[in-house]
Amino acid sequence: MNTKSLAPSALTVVAFIFCMVLVMRPTVVSGASMMPTLHDKDVLIASPLAKRLFQPTRGDIVTVCLSANPLCGFVFSGDTQYVKRLVGVPGDVVRYGTCNIFVTTRTGQKVKDTEPTMVCQDRDEFKQIVLRERMYFVAGDNRGNSLDSRIFGPVSKSQINATVLAQIRLTWTP
């Protein structure tokens, strides 16, 4: 076997793995928690590199993993990865109920929740949390049908796997 012919193939495999781990990672939406923005089975292109190069920003759609597994997000990892909108950043005061989320920045500015949400009505008392450094509040756009920071609490920056860059909706009707 000629080792010169193997070198380009090996280099291609290494480049592909590098891209999948650091640059772009395909993710499939599972469920309706991000409706109407994202639909079940939408394919997303998420970038772990963008998360490392830029500070996560309010309004970003991110992938989040609650486990400490560094391979979370890969198909074979077995861990659940969530796709959510980042609504609260470090220093924010977040007040939330079943559906509504109210954010006040560290400078006292009230942030209007303008992201699309499905119809929902608050059923319980509002809770309040102040986000510490490197802590973020994430929520699904479909607030009445989302497992998010209102349930599992704020997430740390290390639990944010990637920032979503693009969405591909694959539909087929015969």
Label each residue range with its predicted role.
Residues 6, 19-28, 34-174:
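Soluble "head" domains of membrane/secretory-pathway proteins
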Residues 1-13:
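N-terminal Sec-pathway targeting helices
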